[in-house]
Amino acid sequence: MVMTDPIADMLTRIRNANMVRHEKLEVPASKIKKEIAELLKREGFIRDVEYIEDNKQGILRIFLKYGANNERVITGLKRISKPGLRVYAKADEVPRVLNGLGIALLSTSKGVMTDKDARQLQTGGEVVAYVW
């Protein structure tokens, strides 16, 4: 079966595993998914990510992060730019998520980055998702 939006599938898998407090999940790997997972790790939303080689495209194993009382670190994930409706932001229009409490993931010509990084580099791009 052909998947029309693999990034939305990855975000949905993370959201679902987070809701039932799973420790880890696996998603089919791709370059952009790997970059998104590394960004989520760097920003402290997930504990770890590892790439597992297989004879197809590879697998990303994502380890979710929870607080001291087992509260969720990720409270929300939302896909913004979709295959049917792409959303782009210029350098001076990069969105803020919850007044800086969350992050916006942008796909730019310089790679996938957060809204904060895009503002520092004065670059715009496709608004992939919001995470808070």
UniProtKB/Swiss-Prot annotation:
InterPro entries: Ribosomal_uS8, Ribosomal_uS8_CS, Ribosomal_uS8_sf. One of its GO terms (biological process) is translation. Keywords: Ribonucleoprotein, Ribosomal protein, RNA-binding, rRNA-binding. The keyword rRNA-binding applies. GO terms for molecular function: rRNA binding; structural constituent of ribosome. GO terms for cellular component: ribonucleoprotein complex; ribosome. Pfam families: Ribosomal_S8. Signal peptide: none annotated. Disulfide bonds: none annotated. Belongs to the universal ribosomal protein uS8 family. One of the primary rRNA binding proteins, it binds directly to 16S rRNA central domain where it helps coordinate assembly of the platform of the 30S subunit. HAMAP family: Ribosomal_uS8_B (MF_01302_B). PANTHER family: 40S RIBOSOMAL PROTEIN S15A. Part of the 30S ribosomal subunit. Contacts proteins S5 and S12. This is Small ribosomal subunit protein uS8. It comes from Bacillus cytotoxicus (strain DSM 22905 / CIP 110041 / 391-98 / NVH 391-98). The lineage of its organism: Bacteria, Bacillati, Bacillota, Bacilli, Bacillales.
